[in-house]
Amino acid sequence: MKRKVKKMAAMATSIIMAIMIILHSIPVLAGRIIYDNETGTHGGYDYELWKDYGNTIMELNDGGTFSCQWSNIGNALFRKGRKFNSDKTYQELGDIVVEYGCDYNPNGNSYLCVYGWTRNPLVEYYIVESWGSWRPPGATPKGTITVDGGTYEIYETTRVNQPSIDGTATFQQYWSVRTSKRTSGTISVTEHFKQWERMGMRMGKMYEVALTVEGYQSSGYANVYKNEIRIGANPTPAPSQSPIRRDAFSIIEAEEYNSTNSSTLQVIGTPNNGRGIGYIENGNTVTYSNIDFGSGATGFSATVATEVNTSIQIRSDSPTGTLLGTLYVSSTGSWNTYQTVSTNISKITGVHDIVLVFSGPVNVDNFIFSRSSPVPAPGDNTRDAYSIIQAEDYDSSYGPNLQIFSLPGGGSAIGYIENGYSTTYNNVNFANGLSSITARVATQISTSIQVRAGGATGTLLGTIYVPSTNSWDSYQNVTANLSNITGVHDITLVFSGPVNVDYFVFTPANVNSGPTSPVGGTRSAFSNIQAEDYDSSYGPNLQIFSLPGGGSAIGYIENGYSTTYKNIDFGDGATSVTARVATQNATTIQVRLGSPSGTLLGTIYVGSTGSFDTYRDVSATISNTAGVKDIVLVFSGPVNVDWFVFSKSGT
């Protein structure tokens, strides 16, 4: 009997230990527990358990914390956060920051995220920090952003006739999804909202922001042991009651008004992480106090977006004051597509309050007045065409997503450029004439930049063909010949596609050089000329690349491409040329004088070298050439060129 009792006691001990281990592995629910769909407030936070069917348990703990379990569900959401009245934008609420920590154990499809809704427009949004077996949302990303030290991919999806806070509806979903999972940290929610709006993903009036665990046809449990939501840091400032004097000829941000009669007007996000005003209706007025017009202004420009044709009256001192002029605004295509429109106004001098009177819906980013003499005379206000002009130092631009950003090594550049965008640089002084332009650019795809005088539809001076540099962070100089102009002009760069631009500079016309009179800056024909040191080139895909053993070469060449090398000094004469090349296919290189269609001096016949990494020297006879000449290499097919050199007559 004693042995049997001992065995039974041992078995009981083992069972108890097993039960303790099992209990230790399952979250202990000790707070207020709910099992089915319910909303309310708890610990100063709004909570909700929502499911379509299945087994769910949610424990409401102190503050924003909670734990949850789910199994055999279709879709279930557990969340604690803050709800609003759908009467304020995120800018008006101020910065929204979530600090969180979660023991997250999904089995199948699930998300750990910040979740919420906006109204007008109706948007369901997710900032996904971690996930289960499937990374949402299974769509093509619109781009990437970096927030809180992490990289997120951005998505936009459409839900048609699906459940929403307003019943069954069709609405947009916005997603930020981390490229690597995490289950604790800080989420700067407002920064995500700003980046979404930069991409044209318009936010409405805030309904909710909550830390959320969502499950979909899965099971699992989670313990949110930290969830602190801070709202209200750095809100949009209220209109100033004691305005200082403002310069009419500097940009005035539309949201920096002093008073309005509107009950619907709101401060909204604009591209480039800016702000503006929107939700404007017929009869709304906005007043800006103490605008200093100095000796006079006769023009007005505003950056606006609208889907309907409308107009804005510009009045002095009151909504019924002197009508200075009317700005007629045509549809820009969408509420997120901003364009600058201008109008003449009656001359106004001194200091006045300015009132904008609206006839219908429009979003306004900013506005500015122009002086009575809108085109300054050449002089101290001009820019030297032959000194580097930073791309970000434009006087005006077109393109809602265009941005100025910092470069890793210092300085700034412009990017987020799309087809049809443009930047204008006023009062560029070309003095006695120019010959070419060089721009420092980076792009992952081939594109082009038109150089125009007098506006985006002005005289076309030339086109810069930009090959892929392989990365948005890999910058190269590209050059193009331009039609000659003299004096002072406004220059506009018109873009045909995505490209980052650091700076550009023009090259003056060399009025002193002649074909037989070498001048400073000439290059000896009898020393190696590096192929990448061309003065201009033709061919959208041509690239400069690094060689394994050091140095550079040109490649990605196609039939009809060419490179030009200026001021090559042949002295008393040269009769042959040698080039160091690599190619997988036989091809030819014509050596021409002056231009791609100039006098043919000779042709280099290039046999296959076995690969594009195997370089050999090939030679050809050319017509005797003396003096200083511009030399053009014209290619008939793919080849990489390291350098070339000419040989003197008789050698």
UniProtKB/Swiss-Prot annotation:
It catalyses: Endohydrolysis of (1->4)-beta-D-xylosidic linkages in xylans. SMART domains: CBD_IV. It comes from the Bacteria. Gene3D superfamilies: 2.60.120.180, Galactose-binding domain-like. GO terms for biological process: cellulose catabolic process; xylan catabolic process. InterPro entries: CBM6 (IPR005084), Cellulose-bd_IV (IPR006584), ConA-like_dom_sf (IPR013320), Galactose-bd-like_sf (IPR008979), GH11/12 (IPR013319), GH11_AS_1 (IPR018208), GH11_AS_2 (IPR033119), GH11_dom (IPR033123). It is an enzyme of class 3 (hydrolase). Optimum pH is 6.5-7.0. D-xylotriose 2 binds at residues 556, 613, 640. Induction: Up-regulated by growth on xylan. Ca(2+) 1 binds at residues 253, 255, 275, 365. Its main location: secreted. One of its GO terms (cellular component) is extracellular region. Residues 250-370, 387-507, 527-647 form the CBM6 domain. This is Endo-1,4-beta-xylanase A.
